[in-house]
Amino acid sequence: MPALGFLTRQRLRRCFRALPLLLSLWSAVAAAQGDAARVRGTIRAQSGRPLADARVAIIGGDSTVTDGQGSFVLRVATGRALALRVTRAGHVPDSLVLPPLLAGGEHRLALTLTPLAQLAVQQVVAPPSRPLLNASDAATGGVVEGVELRALPTEGRDPIALGFTIPGVAQARGFFGDAPRLSINGGNSLYTQYTIDGMDNNEGFLGGPRVEFPLAALARLEVLANSYSAEFGRSPSGVVNYETRTGGERWTGELFAYNRPGIPFDARSPIVPGGERPADFRRAQDGFRRTQLGGGWGGPLRRGTTYGFGALEYSNENQDRISSTARATFLGRELRETWKVAGRIDHGWSPDQTTTLRFAMSHASRAGEGSGIVAPEADITTIRAGSISGVTHRSAWRGGRSSNVAALQLATYRWDFPPTRSSFNTPQVTILDRDSIPIGIVGSSNFIFDEQELQWQFRDVMEHHLGRAHTLRAGFDVALSSFQLTGSSTNPSGSYEVVNTGNIPSVNGRYRFADIPSDVFVRSYTIDAAQKQVDLTQGLYGVFVEDRWRPTSALTIRAGLRWDYDDLTSRGESSADLDNLQPRLSINWLALPGTVVRGGVGRFAGKLPYAVYSDAVQFGPDGNQTVTFRGAQAPRFGQGPRAVDLDRSALPPREIRELFALGIEQPMSSQLTLGVQQQLGARASASVDLVWVDTRHLPRSWDLNAQGRRIAAGDSVGVPVAVGDASRPVTPVTGGYRRLTTTESGGRSTYAGMYTALRYDLTETLVLDANWVWSHAISNTEDINFNATQGNDFDAERADANNDRRHKVTARATWRTLRGLTMSGIVDYQTGMPLNRVAFFRDLTGSGGTYGDGFIGNYQRFFGVPRNGERLPSALLANASVAYDLRVGGSTVTVRGEAFNVFNRLNYSGFPTGLGGGGSATQVGRPGDPITYTTAAPPRQVQFSVAWRY
């Protein structure tokens, strides 16, 4: 065997002699390795996102790199303390000392790394996705990511509806048609703040979003409910932030068309609104149609330096409307058009300097074309138009250890109710038959409300890393608004009631103003004696400082102090509210690689709706005053006196507002949270948070001339105002007042809840978010126009809040298969909202008319009947979407169908509403009496769409 010739006997003998020595050496090495210890852990960014490619090294020893889940395993020597160092590009390095480990032992640890400011434009336009664990702070709330925004069923492409799936957020019960639809922690929806990329997006007069943002331009919807950073202010409840989409490294875009065909695809509503005949209401449902068109485009305007994105959405719908009287039924129509536009350009001047230009606007118009007995010429159009234009500049220095973000924004808003076809040179006329039953309304509309707002905002936030453990943030925010309001409680040309004695002709049951003869019999004439122009301002100022302290690599403590000032508190008889200091403290402890313990405590100041100031002027001593002339005092048709012709000292007593006669303060909440998050494997996490909120200084209406009469056990019928006037401190007289009201800050609400949430994220395949909120909200006021039913006894009004629901369970899911099929859905279950029993709208104390009751529905109750003492039935809503992608060349065509209220469940609560008076939530009688349902959530509705994406 020549190939083995080198193995001589002598060499084989030497090998066998060396074998025991080699075996002993191998055993020693194996023993040494068995005696070694291991360090196992997870490295995360401060946000909680696992960090891949982070280097973990024993100083003077071995090192390793984290995997895609941020995990690592490192063998270390035993019997002595070791220094471990963690580094990763774009983050502050961190070090810690490991205690001596025993042979074969294992040490588990979790670390977070503080990010450096990375302002290269590529980083600005590519923000990271939401992590399973929040390792940064104790803020509660949640996020709806971009992939969910575009896949989940969304009626009317309204992103606000998706916010209802976030813990602590629910559908709001408002008090006017355009009331904000989102409530946080059972509070009034007026106090929820809205931002776009951190900048103000609030309609300042009352509240709610200034700009209706296009869904196609939205990258992420975030809600901060509790224990959030001192950087955010002006709300005692929470903040809704729209994060806008940016252009990427390649051009992408979409064009889409949506259609809501209505009946027969939609189900018919089984609830007929009060006053309408079922057959007429069913016929009106046949007239609904909606079409939506739009698109979005984005990409590199100049690769590596400039990126842009823009979106445009248009909606057109019509709704047939039928209102019935005992004598006449007419088919009417409302035409609705909405435009939404948004655009953003990001430009990188250098790796440390980036500028963003941002623009958004929306214009919503609802044009009434007549309804019931209202002729088209007498109907109104509702217009809500808002815009924002802003610039943000980001800069960094010291290698990203210091940074600054400065932003300037100009915003506008208009809310107007002009006549659809006519002008205010024509009065409104109500035509009565011989039995005094209205049979027609012609002429023009019967009120003026034209409000405009212009706002400048400047915001600056600076951040400095002070060594390894401290990150200091400080900033200020100023928003200056000017408002213009033209308001009149009637048509400037007056409002007539005339009787048709056979001398007013009609065509097919329709009447026209031009056909009313000059000698028609006038039953009454009503005019606002003092139409009002209110041009005032509001200034909001905020300053904050916050230290993010990391005493260990797993523990983050945020200690902040914020100060806010609303200069409305300095108007009238009030003194400036300058003591709004808000200390905030939160902890976030990464106790184990997959376990976070968090908690927070702090104070949160809100701002006042501008309307509390404007209303006090508009309805003040020199403000609006409506007067009616009847019978012999009624003028001839067309010859009624105008406001300038009236002697106000001869007019009957009314309600007059005083400007903050008792002083006013900004709303302030104290909040406490405590919770734990647990990662379940690589793709899931669960959390439980306890929340407590105590909100004080809520504005409400106070009567400075309150009557002393109270409701007794035997009171069951209405009494004249003269009875109530006798118990007022100042007896009402001609030219004076009956109620002398002011807005004051004695309102209080409390909220206690438990948020339980589960999240499963399989990236491109399945995303599931589910939560259960168990809570209780109590309040003694519901709105700025909330009045006590008896004098100023607000203790008797303390009850479950209008937006309280004890249980709310929500789940949303998006599942994308490998064959282009995407299915998604939302399920929302909640217990019923409170129901308020009133005494058949009777005036049991002779208090007279009260401004605000028509909005809120808090009319007088029978003796012993508590406010909101009963509940509407629970609600269950399920929405579903099915989409299929077809590849066409290098693009994709998506065909999609969506169904809302899939099971066609009849829900009497659990849906956003802005019905004045409360709808079904306001019932007459006493507890246990039958409930009459006049409103309900929409029945099953179907929406179809097609989209082309490239």
Name what the model sees in each region.
Residues 552, 683, 687-837:
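Gram-negative outer-membrane beta-barrel transporters
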